[in-house]
A protein has these predicted regions:
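Catalytic machinery of carbohydrate-active enzymes
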Residues: 1-270
Length: 270
């Protein structure tokens, strides 16, 4: 079995996408199966699929072109009509196709090198709470003042150290919070997705408004408080111990009392 995985950047040109498909075919021959797992129906995806010409194509977002297997119909209904969690939809899709049954969970393997370098810094803290303050948009990102309120609320409930999880855009905010509060820390290494995942993997609790961080918590079964600006049934918290706080369109409108209640519930159940 030859498995080819790849990432296409949003800014890739149509020629680059066509060339990528051609190169795969030239190097490996006609693929038996193309699993197209993007969440959006777009022209570039269609061009890649048509150029690749795999014998069978899977997707679950309701595309009806003849190139897609009829086996996709029920899985697409789960996604488009029933709005089922995405891992559940794909587990169903693969079972429909005759693959061995798999659990409907997220997976994010990490190398020993990444785990070791993060654990080296975190080891002295013992148990810690991983606090992520950034979502995929400004509306889903906590302002500095609300972040301060959240930290104060956490520290009123527990004396467990807090580690700020952040991307490149959140570094200044993370530095400011670490400087202002006792028992609040950040990783000194440059931020990366894998390093953030390593922090989430070992956390006592994760707190996040971002679904990508939430998926990490689900993958590692880390107890989590998920904060949604706009709740989406396709992206639920899937850890055994979790609470969700639904805010509305702007994440800064979070109720601190509701947040504290969710945090208490998670702490009590661990």
């Amino acid at each position: 079995l030859t498995l080819v995985t790849m990432t296409m950047q949003d800014h890739a040109t149509l020629k680059e996408i066509k060339d990528l498909a051609k190169n795969i075919t030239l190097q490996y021959g006609t693929p038996d199966l193309c699993i197209e797992a993007m969440r959006k129906k777009n022209l570039k995806t269609m061009i890649f699929i048509s150029q690749l010409k795999a014998k069978t194509n899977f997707q679950v977002v309701g595309l009806t072109m003849k190139c897609y297997s009829p086996l996709c119909k029920n899985a697409s209904r789960m996604d488009q009509n029933l709005r089922a969690p995405v891992p559940m939809t794909w587990a169903f899709m693969m079972r429909e196709a005759g693959f061995p049954a798999v659990r409907s969970i997220y997976e994010l393997p990490l190398s020993d090198d990444v785990l070791d370098e993060v654990r080296e810094e975190m080891r002295s803290l013992g148990s810690y709470i991983a606090l992520n303050l950034e979502g995929s948009s400004q509306e889903r990102t906590f302002s500095l003042s609300i972040a301060e309120n959240l930290i104060a609320k956490i520290q009123s409930e527990t004396d467990i150290p807090i580690v700020i999880v952040y991307g490149p855009k959140g570094e200044d905010k993370a530095r400011a919070l670490v400087d202002c509060y006792n028992n609040v820390y950040r990783l000194s290494l440059s931020p990366s997705i894998k390093r953030s995942a390593a922090i989430i993997k070992d956390a006592y609790i994760a707190i996040t408004p971002d679904t990508s961080i939430l998926h990490m918590a689900s993958a590692y079964n880390t107890p989590v408080v998920a904060i949604y600006a706009d709740y989406k049934t396709r992206w639920p918290a899937m850890a055994d111990v979790s609470e969700s706080v639904v805010v509305g369109q702007k994440i800064d409108n979070i109720s601190l009392d509701e947040f504290a209640k969710a945090l208490k519930s998670v702490l009590a159940r661990i």
